[in-house]
């Protein structure tokens, strides 16, 4: 199931485990098939109801809130930072390469659903939700 959606746990020795991003097709609210925004930014992900994540959220509540506040205070977890990352990534690709991508994948469904503005808007709303969830105020 999707108990750890968009995440993977991995180990090299069976003792120390790592957590990383994986299969990010549903990021920023996008449905896995790319045809619609499937969940609102101000809603809890389905994974929050899973036993594993409930245990993590309860056991590490203080650490999660502290880390969240640190990332927000340093402007790392912000729309401005996301914008800078997107601009930096976009600068690596020429207009011709963008056109070639669209020509190769003309029926990519998310082309008509998402955009940078949609992502920034969704993320801004998500931050408001997370600020509330982690009791964060500036």
Identify the function of each model-found stretch:
Residues 1-138:
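Middle-to-C-terminal accessory/interaction subdomains
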């Amino acid at each position: 199931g999707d108990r750890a959606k968009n995440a993977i746990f991995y180990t090299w020795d069976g003792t120390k485990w790592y957590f990383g991003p994986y299969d990010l097709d549903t990021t920023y609210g996008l449905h896995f098939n790319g045809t619609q925004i499937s969940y609102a930014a101000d809603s809890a992900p389905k994974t929050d109801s899973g036993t594993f994540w409930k245990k993590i959220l309860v056991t590490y509540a203080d650490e999660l809130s502290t880390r969240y506040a640190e990332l927000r205070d340093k402007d790392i977890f912000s729309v401005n930072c996301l914008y800078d990352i997107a601009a930096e990534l976009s600068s690596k690709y020429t207009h011709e390469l963008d056109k070639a991508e669209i020509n190769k994948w003309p029926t990519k469904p998310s082309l008509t659903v998402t955009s940078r503005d949609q992502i920034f808007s969704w993320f801004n709303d998500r931050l408001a939700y997370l600020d509330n969830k982690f009791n964060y105020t500036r």
